[in-house]
C-alpha cells in the first residue's frame, strides 16, 4: 500500500472551489477507508482512481493508512474554474 509521500502517486486535483485527493482504488479498499467515504467524493472506474474530497474523506483515508505528515506535501494539479473531477460519478462503496 502507498503510504502518503510525495513520490507515491498521491496528489490533489484542485479547482477554484474545492480539492480532491487522487487515490488508487485498490489502496483505498485495502485500507478499509472505503466504508466511510461520502458521496462528495468521485470515482473513475476506468482508471481505478477515487478522488476524495478534501474536507473529510481525504483525511479519513490518510488516517487509515497511518499518514502523519502535512497534507500539503502532495503535488497539485490546479484547474482555473471547475475541475473535470466534478463530472465523474459520485463515490459509492
Regions found by a protein language model. Name each.
Residues 6-10, 36-39, 74-75:
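Intrinsically disordered, low-complexity boundary segments flanking structured domains
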Residues 51-93:
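Short, compact, well-ordered microdomains
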Residues 10-12, 21, 41-43, 53, ...:
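Generic preference for hydrophobic/aromatic residues in regular secondary structure cores
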Residues 1-27:
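Short N-terminal "domain-start" leader segments
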Residues 2, 50-51:
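Alpha-helical interaction segments
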Amino acid at each position: 500500500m502507498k503510504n502518503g509521500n510525495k513520490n507515491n502517486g498521491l496528489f490533489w486535483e484542485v479547482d477554484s472551489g474545492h480539492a480532491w485527493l487522487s487515490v488508487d482504488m485498490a489502496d483505498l479498499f485495502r485500507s478499509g477507508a472505503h466504508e466511510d467515504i461520502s458521496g462528495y467524493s468521485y470515482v473513475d472506474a476506468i482508471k481505478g482512481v477515487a478522488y476524495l474530497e478534501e474536507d473529510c474523506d481525504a483525511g479519513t483515508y490518510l488516517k487509515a493508512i497511518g499518514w502523519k505528515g502535512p497534507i500539503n506535501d502532495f503535488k497539485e494539479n490546479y484547474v482555473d474554474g471547475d475541475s473535470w473531477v466534478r463530472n465523474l460519478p459520485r463515490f459509492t462503496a
